[in-house]
């Protein structure tokens, strides 16, 4: 006798913003490849499923969205991710710093200001140790200093700063 299958969760994922490095602890493999699907089409698809969920009165259905693997979005993508988060009843206000390409000076200040104007109120950094230890785990020299400099600049602008520090015994060989 056939059984009815009722889905409870839909997850949509788009590799839109390539990662500038590959962390040794990351679960997303080969994250430098970018999907050929434009973000605007991805957003339309997800909105159609939200509309379907509403029309079918499927309050029991959870729709999850991930656009990554880094949050190095252009402003239009950032606004689109915010629209998708609003459909879930949330706000997209904190930007994760992992995997961003390195910017400096006026370019970094302008990048930060563009995000502040677009509604980002703070930044989050996941740090795998201090200084060179973090850099080794993340596969990019200077990454620890880069992420902490963005947090400092954000704090100077009155923005929220969030840090997560991973504590573990270092098992990486010295290079």
Show the residue positions of the predicted features.
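Secondary-structure boundary elements
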Residues: 153-160
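Core AdoMet radical
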Residues: 9, 30-40, 55-73, 85-107, ...
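Canonical Radical SAM [4Fe-4S] cluster-binding loop centered on the CxxxCxxC motif
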Residues: 1-44
